[in-house]
Structure formats: structure tokens, C-alpha cells
């Protein structure tokens, strides 16, 4: 079994019963694959597939001028490499993007040759098409310096859908069926029945019209319409009555209106009897071909075809006319015998299209098209061209209508065609097929579609969303180009004169900057990043809105199984509209979610894994992942629990066709991190999933002792850790960088065989949490590709570590844990267990004002030297300074306009010559309520403005760091080259060389060591081939040096060029403050099971409940928080955590008494291999076993995968192993060893009964009391009402609301109430009066008129009612 570099150091013992058959796919694959498909940057231009940018270009180009004599063709596109890297973009507030250039060809045709087109001239040119933001390797975008994520959208797939209104529209509760054809782009076409069973259509939700208008408009006559939707009854008229051609099926269930006889006149069905199956068999046996029917049987039937007099050509009756006596008379007169009528009945063949045709007043195709034109463009006069153009543009034009590949596939599947490809526009037979199915549905045949089925909803990823925006921009460009193409020849224009890239740039910028789906990345911890990128939203442009979404859309659907997580979704108005992808879910080429299954053949599980979409899944019988199988993969049980078409049932093994790949298949990443998820209530699991994303990274991350085994995947895929790009040996490591000498077999010729990893140190995340990477390798370590070299925020040895393992006791403690409050020991705070670092960014800009430029300087009048003490000569704070609220960080002065001086001031000015008061101090100060340490300063200066010393120093430091990297690379490259050289030179014969090397001497190692390396090249060798090799190595070293010098120059040029700043800004300074936040009462904390609470008190360590050996608990939780919430998982986690820590203590004790390695091996084997998944400890050397044991002292980490976790029996075994009887007796444990006798810390008395005690992974959430606590002294007031503003951001007051007023009224506290409603709120004169009175020492309140009363009076006056206040 292969262990990675970090896995060896600390193996997580897994309780999984099932082997891993399918690895969890890369968690950010959807985002990265989608965007790389969009760009196709690494694909040669000629081999690009028609998707993404290529598809957008080819769909708009070629653009042809109005006269047709000039056209602009698209050849290919190319993306340049970005000007700044990701880190530089974040610092400078730029977008990480690449310039898109398209090669286009302008073709001008000869106007003189009218017959066939002759090309007159061709101009080809590369044209700039705007900037395209690039995705970072972790799946986010850097837009204006901030990281953003484009969330995937779950929208209704294009295609055709049939539904009914569930009887809600009409009072009778009748089901009204409707169909809707939804294209990817273009007009929607709806068909719907009304309560009278007439079929209407509407375009884009406009006014409805009878559907036969549309059928006539596509060129069908009434006869053809009827022939398409009905079968006919054939009658032959006799002198008396008529004969009906006998079709047995059509008579079943009808009541005979006359005696039905066979050919011999024998009565088979008597009058008024219902015709049943036996009657029909008798008629068939009698070989009846025709049935004689009386004349009145014909009356009221509907003619299927026009009846024309053969002699005169006169139309006697039209199709869809009713047969009346007068019609029959005319027919007999004309001698017409055979007529056809529509066959309808009340059960399964309604006369809907016939009734619709009767309502329709249009006569022919033209009239129908005019009617449609009038509906679409009311009030415009219909000319023939306009009418034709509009109708063709609606559904038949490729520019305006696109069903898309998906839409065509879904359409063809739904209407029952075999092929899934076809034209992207709507065809006549598509419209007919849709109406036919809709009529069949109304007739009671077939099923309506389930709109929430994941086969009818597809995911639009970044690439597709960006492509749509880009295409929209291109279409705007196309319009402009069309206009100008006409003048292209006469004005001798080049392609770049025709194309203006502004519309494309603005469309892209708007999408990435302000679209509803482009969101500020949630960067609180690695899990929140991953979850954000795997989120699927039903909101956004082209999706649902919160208000319109009902319960059905938000609900969990059977097809979500393995595709979308049923647990993780926000609470509140977005519940069910924003979802998370399940762990193994994957998108297919059409954008439908698929999930993997193992193929089962003849009740034997094979290794074949198939990805099935929701549509395909419905056809198979699928067993769950926990079905029992023997070692050969044979299903054992007589009945297996399985699913088919959304229903769960027990079936025999031979019927099973597929099986789930893993028990965790149905949940998302966040939910799969919750141990014992199977024992938690779904609502609490939902809260647990959401709260893990709010966990603040702690100063020292600690792995969870009870995990689920997915922590490593999560940490590595999030990109917070540093992974080895290639294997090799660690050559150098410090806190900020790791240098790796790459293995020879992985080094590529022509590339540097050195990998340098610069770690991220104390950087601010989007949520102001701290991102910091710490190396976990030592010099000389051998690492392989993909191994973790450095831990990031919230990771510990390459595993996700969101919180800390706390010793938890479930017991009440003096009411301090009432209502989910949390009691915490002072030791937790003293040990900095939950201390987190938050980084605040404070900006100041110096602008060019009308009165002159603002200046960043240390020279500020009216400021004491104490306040300027922390600023350097440029007026910018030193790094490392500890600052409090109100301290100056950057000194800045702004010119202010000359004010009119009083004569006294003029006199003072004349005497003291004080000129400094024409500037005002606008320095950057630390905001109220904040204090911390300055950890970084960035200075940006506009081009052409002299840099100050501080800015120059920052640039020099950056260059020094870069030079260090280059020197390391060169050192290793040269070292390798000289090693190769030494191997080659030793033993060769020389023709001469430095230090008087004689001709014919053999070179030995000692001679080489004595020489300076660079003098080796002066040795002249006798062997020509070797001499050539020597020359080649010398050249390659010189070439590398030259490359490094060029790279350094380029870096210097980039750093010394002026910064791009917003207009009017001369200089910008960013100061970063690190704020340490310790745990304090009021902070929100939570476990992983939705068990959240607020810290109520931090108790001295000596007062906490303690065990018999004197160890106190860290946290005391209320036991009443468990039963009603039904999240029992937390109790099991505490038991297993107790065992994990106990085992760690036993290993620690062995190490302390320096037990033999063999004893350690035996104990570790007992832990790892007596239950659950087996670990290969045999392959470990003694050193590795020792290192493993050292890392296990703080607890043996357990993995209990979701739905496949540790059983009670296994937990019992682990507890027995951790606490042998002597320890259990000492601690006075219960027999099952999960409850311990505790003693009261204040009295020393033992508690009445034993307490459940153990370790739980507990998190500190991002809702910190420091961010919410706030007090107002004097602050801003609202403009109109003159009441204080509200909220911390506005430095507002606390609202004294309606209910608080009632409370004071109830106590009769009238003066307090008057004070609250006047001088403490909006009595403007009273407010100032109070201050005056206090100054005079006269403590009286003069309450006046509240301003809001004046506002009310004004409002009433605006209604025309005059109110005057009688002041007496």
C-alpha cells in the first residue's frame, strides 16, 4: 500500500467496511474543465472544437455587408500571456486577464461582375478583441484585485415540456394541459388548452390565438390539419340510411342507438345495449365489413374533407362542417355516395382540433401569418415582406433561434424519435409532433413531465455563461461592422478600423464584475472556498427568482441522489434554490449531472464503473453501496434494498443491474466531513454543513481526532496547501520558501531542474481571515510528485483542521449553559487554542484636487510628536508598529480654500507668520474599535511622479527576494552541471590546462578539486568528442545565466514602471493590520452536528469540573441540547474522541518510558488492524514507526466515513484498548468506559453521578462579538427625521422601539419616556439645550418638539389638511 510523505507521518485509522472502488474526483474539476473548454488556449487554432470562444466567433462571423460585396471572415484567435501574475494583480487591484486577439480577413468582391462573385482584394489582420479574465489554478478569478467565483447555474433544459395546471386554474378543477418549446436562445412557443377544450398557442407569453392559425401559417390546409389529428369513419350513402365501414375497436363501450345485425340480418347487438368485447368478437366472427346505420346516425358528425360536385366543381360542404339534413340532401342530389367523417368519442379521442378550427377565423396561409404579425407587432401596418420576415425570424432563422445540441436531443427524445441530432431551428414537423403529443395527453394517453427531474434541468458552468456574454458582445459588434462594411472599399479600411472591441470588453466586464452569478469568494477557510466553487444556483439571469419559486422546486427530488446534496443548502429565503454538488457528481457533454455506479452482471459486482445521468438511471435497478457482497463480488442477501425510477424496493439479486460506488455518494463535501452523519437529524446536519464553512482558522490548526477520511482530499484540492509539482530532494527550506532539487527522471530537458515554492505569509483573505503557509518538510527530505510540502490556513499535516479538539463534559453548570450557552475553561484561552488572526486592509489615496495636490507627508501641523512617532520620513507607519484606535498610519494633508480672515487673525498672522493653516489634516487613522500590528505596507505611485524613499525601499526588497530565487536556481543548475562535468573529466587525457597541466596527463579528482570550477573549462582535452561536450556544458551554463539576467531585468522593469491608478489619484498607500482575536464571551461556537451556542462565561481553570487524576474539562455543554435536536452524532463523536485521546496517551506513556519499538509495533497493529480498514505497518522502518508514534501522542486520528462508520461494538473495543481496567478504575469509569466520575472544582465534592466526557472537534465561527459590539457617544443624525442613524457601520444608536415604549408606559415612567422620545432622539433644540444646562451645572431637561412630529405635520399638510399648533 502506497503512503504519501505526510500520510506516513500520521495514519488516520478508518472504520470503513468497504474498500475504495472509485477515488473521489478532483473537487474543482467542473470549474477548471469548463473554463479550459471555453478558452481552448492550449489547442492549436486549426484543431479547436466548435465550443466556447471558437463557437461564439463562428456563429457570428462571417459578417456580410448589406449590399453583399464585402464580408469579414474569422480565421483564428490567440490569447497573450497575462502582464501581471495573480499575486501582483491582487496587490495592485487589477484584473488577472489575457488580451484576446482575433485574426480576421476582409474580403471585397468585384461589383462589376454581376454573374459570379469575383474576389477583388483580401486583407488579413490581427485585431484586439478585449481582455478575457483568466481562471486561477484554484478555480477563482481575480477581478479588480479581489477573488471572485462564478457559480454554476441550474436552469431548465432547452427542449419541449408537457405539463398541466393541477386543476388550479379553473373552478371546476379540470386539468388544463399545456406544452412549451423552450429554445436555448429565441422565442418561447406555448400551447395550452382552455376550459372549453380549445387549443391555443402563444409566442413569448403574448396574447393567445387558436393553434390552427399556426398550423395554417406553416402551410397546412384545414383538410391536412384534420388528416393529421383524426382517423376517419367511411360512410356509403344508401337510398335509406347508410353503411358504415366496420372498425371493431371504435365501437367498444358505445351504446347502440339501433339494432346491429350481421349480413344475414341476425341481431347481434340490441338497441340501447352497451357494446362489449363479446359483441365485437361476434361481429368479427360474422366477418362483418359494413354495418347498416339509420340516417340520423350521420347527423351531427363532422366532415373530414371538402365535398365537391364532380360535374360542376361546386363545393357542397367544406371540411370540418357538420352533417345536417340539408347537407345530406345536397349530397344525394349531386349523386355523391362516399363521405368521410371524423371519428371522435368522449373517452380517448376528443374533437379538440376540430373545435379549434371552428373558432379560427383565418382562411389561408397569408391571413394566418398576418394574424400572427398583428399579435406580435400590434399597431404596425402588415406589409407582405414584413409579415414573411417576422414569421421566418421567429422559429426558422439561425440567428434568432437556437435550440442547441441539448435542446434538439431533449426534443427528439421526448417526441419519440431515434436520432438525437438534427437542425438547431424549429421545423414544421416539430410543431406538429408537439401538438400531437399534447392532444394525446388530453385524450388520456401518456404522462406529463416532471419539471424538477434532473433530466429536465441542466447546469450552465462558467465557460458556458462566459461564452453567452461574449457572444452577446460580438452581436453588438456585428451590427456596427455591418454599417461600416459598405464603406470598406471606398475608404480603403483595414479590419481594425471596422471592429471596435468596446462592446465585447464591457459585456465581459459586466458579467465578471456585477452579474448575480459572479460572487465575492467566501474565503473564511479552505472548505468554504471549495463549497463556493461547487455551488449550483437556480437563481440568476435566465433562472428562477426567490419570490416565484414554490415548494416543489426547492424540494429534494429522487434524481438528486448522487448528483446534488440533499443536506447542504442555506437556511432562509434561498433554501433549496442554492445547492451543492454531491461528492462524485460530474457533468456530461450536455450539462446534465451524472453519478457513477458499479455495473452488476448476474448478481456479481464488476469493476466497471459507468456514469449515468438522471434520464438513464430511471431505466435500471440500482442497489445501495452497503449491500452485502462476498470476496468474489457476489451479492449474498436473498433480498437487496434497491431503487428503480425513484422508488425504493426490496428485490432479488438477479434483478440488480448497478450498485452505488460509495456510501458517501449522496452528500456534498461539507456534509461528508461530519462524522456519524447517519445519526443526526437532517435539519441539524444542514446547520452543521453550513457552519463548518464559517469556522475561523485558528492560530495553531489541530486535526480532528474523529474525522471521516475526506479531510485530506479536501485540504489538498482546495489549493491552500503547497503540493510538490515534481518529485525530488528538499535542498533548502525556511519559513517563506522551499527549494527542491528535482529528480533526474522527472526533469525535462531544456527546463531548470529546480522547483522553488514561495509560501504565502500572513495574507488577508476576502473575509479578513489570515492565510499563512507553514513548511512541513526538512532539508534532505525526499518527496514525490503531489506530496504536501507546506500547510495552509486550517490544515494540519495536509489534513483539513477547522477547529480544535476539546475535552467536553455534558452537564449543567450553575445555569451558565442554559439555552445552548457554552462554558469554557480559562486554560483554553490561555493556551491560545481559539486565538485567530484577522487582517484588516486600510487605504488612503492622495488625489489631485482643484485647490492643488494632496500630499503624503510626515510634516503635519497641530500633531504632537508622540502621534507622529511611528511614521517614517515619508509619513508612512513602520512595519511592526503596534497601533490603537485613532493612531495615525499615513500622514496626509489636503489644501483647503482661503477663508476670509477676521482683522484679529490677520494681526496674529502678521506677527507670527503662520502660513500652515491653508492645509487640513486628512491622515489615515486606525478606525474606532480596532487595534493591531502593522504587518505590511504597499505604496503605489502614478507614472511620472517621484517615488518616496519608502516606495523605493519596498521595490528593492521585492527585487532582493527575486534575486534570491534566481541565485538558488543558478546554484543548483551549476552544481548539477559541474557534477556531470566532473564525472566526464575524471580519467580523460589532457592536452594542457591551468596550473601547468602537462600534455598527456590523465585528469584525476584531486586536480579538479584543487581548481576553481570555472577554470575547468580552460582544460584542453585530447578527445575531440569530450572537448565538444565540455564546450556544450559551458554554453548551457552561460545561456542559463543570460536567461536569469533577462528575467531579473524584466522583473525590475515591471516593478519600476508607474502603477495604473484611478483617474485623479497620484499616490495610494495600503496598510495591513494584523489583529489578534482571543476567545471571549459572546463569540459563537459550534460542533459539526449543528450544535451551536454562544460562549457565556470563561471560568478559572480551578473552578472547572475535573477527573480523579486532576485533569479539568475544557468545555461544559448542556445535555438538554441533545435529545430534542436529535443530533446524537455528537455524543458518539465524544465517545470515539475519548478513545482516540486515550490511545494517544498510552502511546505517549510508552515513548516516555522508552519502550521497545517491537512493543510499539504490536500496540499500533492492535489499533489499526483489528477492525476496519487494514493498514500496511509492515512496510514501515523503525524510524518511521517512531515518527508515527510521536505524531500520535496527541490522539490517534480516526476516520468514520458517513453511512459506513464505526459501530458501537468497534467503539467499545477502542475504549477498552485505550482505558485498560487499572486506568478505568482509577478514573472511576462506568463499565462501558464512556462516562467518568467528575469533581466540582469549587468545592472538591464529587458530582452525584458519572458524566459523559470525551473529545469533540469544536469550531469558533466567524460571528465574533468584537465585530458586533459597539457603543455610540455623539454621532450622525438622519437628514429628514433628525433621529440617530442605526447600525455599527454608521456609528448609530440603539433603536428604542414600540415595545420598549410600552414597557416604560406600563411602569408609568413618564419622564424617562419623555427623555427617550425627545432629547435623546430628535428634539434638535432640546439636544443642544441639555448640553448647555450641563455646562452651567443646571441638571434640567427642557424638552421641545420632536422633529419627527414636524415631519408628520408636513406630510398631513401635503394631503391638503392644514394643521396649526396651538402653543398655549
UniProtKB/Swiss-Prot annotation:
GO terms for molecular function: DNA binding; DNA-directed RNA polymerase activity; ribonucleoside binding. InterPro entries: DNA-dir_RNA_pol_bsu_ext_1_sf, DNA-dir_RNA_pol_bsu_external_1, DNA-dir_RNA_pol_su2, DNA-dir_RNAP_su2_dom, DNA-dir_RNAP_su2_hyb_sf, RNA_pol_bsu_bac, RNA_pol_bsu_CS, RNA_pol_bsu_protrusion. GO terms for biological process: DNA-templated transcription. It is an enzyme of class 2 (transferase). PROSITE patterns: RNA_POL_BETA (PS01166). SUPFAM superfamilies: beta and beta-prime subunits of DNA dependent RNA-polymerase. Keywords: DNA-directed RNA polymerase, Nucleotidyltransferase, Transcription, Transferase. The keyword Transcription applies. It comes from the Bacteria. Its EC number is 2.7.7.6. GO terms for cellular component: DNA-directed RNA polymerase complex. It catalyses: RNA(n) + a ribonucleoside 5'-triphosphate = RNA(n+1) + diphosphate. NCBIfam families: PRK00405.1, rpoB. Belongs to the RNA polymerase beta chain family. The RNAP catalytic core consists of 2 alpha, 1 beta, 1 beta' and 1 omega subunit. When a sigma factor is associated with the core the holoenzyme is formed, which can initiate transcription. PANTHER family: DNA-DIRECTED RNA POLYMERASE I SUBUNIT 2. DNA-dependent RNA polymerase catalyzes the transcription of DNA into RNA using the four ribonucleoside triphosphates as substrates. This is DNA-directed RNA polymerase subunit beta. It comes from Burkholderia vietnamiensis (strain G4 / LMG 22486) (Burkholderia cepacia (strain R1808)).
